[in-house]
């Protein structure tokens, strides 16, 4: 993994009215890192991801992307093309085929011509095992298939960083494995990824950096071995014990 910082979060805060959801968050992501953010529901994990993608506007602090404070950016679509997000609810266009779903962002944001967009879309749909379904509409697909299309769509945009917001939480249990395998294969390509997940075995296997959040703060971060085998924070220990017991 590189020591080059891609994303640096400094003193990040986010409140919804009186409810402070993120409380002075500080951590950084190096190029090539696969970072898994874990913690109980309501700990602020998804809000943090949405702030990084500017879907939520932070209340305070800085988010540096390649050294630039993105909270001062004037071109949010260009930034989001570099820091793409895979949503738990897929966010596919229901009226478009699988192929069109993977082409439209390239054409509108990257200004790719039709042939180039189609070539890239086909390449990544093949990679996630969805090439046979290029003419299908999302309603004809299973949840696992929809998520694989959503991942291919993001990969086709050639992003610098990919954010995954609980990518398996909306799936039937039998579909979870196929999506996790796709994400593992992407991690092996050396892409920079931040993954919010409740899948502890997956987090341990796929990441080189684990962040544990509790009640809007980062309690602890480290390598998977440090977090899963020798956690220091009492909240981390309690959280992992609950998972082991379940």
Regions found by a protein language model. Give the residues of each.
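Helix-to-loop junction immediately C-terminal to a conserved catalytic motif
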Residues: 53
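Catalytic Walker B motif of ABC-type/P-loop ATPase nucleotide-binding domains
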Residues: 162-165
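A short, proline-enriched helix->beta-strand linker immediately N-terminal to the Walker B motif
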Residues: 156-160
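Conserved ABC transporter NBD signature motif
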Residues: 61-71
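Conserved ABC ATPase "signature" region
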Residues: 71, 103, 114-132, 181
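Conserved ABC ATPase signature
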Residues: 137-141, 145
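ABC ATPase NBD coupling module
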Residues: 70-84, 114-115, 188, 230-231
């Amino acid at each position: 993994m590189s020591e080059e910082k891609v994303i640096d979060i400094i003193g990040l805060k986010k409140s919804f009215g009186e409810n402070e959801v993120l409380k002075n968050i500080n951590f950084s992501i190096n190029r090539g890192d696969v970072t898994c953010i874990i913690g109980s529901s309501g700990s602020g994990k998804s809000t943090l991801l949405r702030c990084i993608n500017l879907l939520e506007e932070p209340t305070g602090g800085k988010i540096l992307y390649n050294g630039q404070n993105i909270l001062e950016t004037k071109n949010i679509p260009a930034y989001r093309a570099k820091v793409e997000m895979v949503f738990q609810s897929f966010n596919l266009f229901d009226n478009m085929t699988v192929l069109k779903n993977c082409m439209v962002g390239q054409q509108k944001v990257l200004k790719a011509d039709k042939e180039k967009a189609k070539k890239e879309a086909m390449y990544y749909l093949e990679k996630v095992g969805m090439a046979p379904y290029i003419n299908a509409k999302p309603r004809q697909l299973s949840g696992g298939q929809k998520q694989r299309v959503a991942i291919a769509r993001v990969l086709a945009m050639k992003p610098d960083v990919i954010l995954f917001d609980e990518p398996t939480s909306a799936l039937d249990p039998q579909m979870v494995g196929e999506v996790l395998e796709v994400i593992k294969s992407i991690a092996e390509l050396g892409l920079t990824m931040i993954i919010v997940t409740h899948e502890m075995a997956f987090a341990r296997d796929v990441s080189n950096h684990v962040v544990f959040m509790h009640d809007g703060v980062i309690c602890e971060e480290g390598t998977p071995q440090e977090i899963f085998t020798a956690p220091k924070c009492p909240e981390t220990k309690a959280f992992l014990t609950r998972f082991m017991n379940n």
